[in-house]
Amino acid sequence: DLLNKPKEIKEKILIGRVEKRLKELSLMDQTFIKDSNLSIEELIKQNISLLGENIKIRRFERFVLGEGLNKRSDDFANEVAQIINAN
């Protein structure tokens, strides 16, 4: 998708892509799951000013969208047939 673009535009696109990826990987730059308008860094700063105490992140858990969900492979027609045959 970058083949026919001028050199200056290619550089800007690549810089944008790298920055976007770094934002996804860095905890402090990620969006807060309960309020997508806040980054984790902004949330921590808000809570520091609210509490008047310093806050340090000691540990965190990483969640991936859809992780841990198992797709069910139920066959509804087969289920109904089994129920009918059982009676």
UniProtKB/Swiss-Prot annotation:
UniProt record, GO biological process: mitochondrial translational elongation
UniProt-listed InterPro entries: EF-Ts_dimer_sf, Transl_elong_EFTs/EF1B, Transl_elong_EFTs/EF1B_dimer
Record keyword Plastid present: yes
Alphabetic keyword roster: Chloroplast, Elongation factor, Plastid, Protein biosynthesis
One Pfam entry name: EF_TS
GO cellular component: chloroplast; mitochondrion
Predominant location: plastid
Superkingdom field: Eukaryota
Gene Ontology MF terms in the entry: translation elongation factor activity
Record carries keyword Hydrolase: no
Location of this chain's protein in the cell: Plastid, Chloroplast
Reported function: Associates with the EF-Tu.GDP complex and induces the exchange of GDP to GTP. It remains bound to the aminoacyl-tRNA.EF-Tu.GTP complex up to the GTP hydrolysis stage on the ribosome.
Family membership noted in the UniProt record: Belongs to the EF-Ts family.
HAMAP family with a match to the protein in the record: EF_Ts (MF_00050)
Protein's name according to its UniProt entry: Elongation factor Ts, chloroplastic
Organism phylogeny: Eukaryota, Rhodophyta, Florideophyceae, Rhodymeniophycidae, Ceramiales
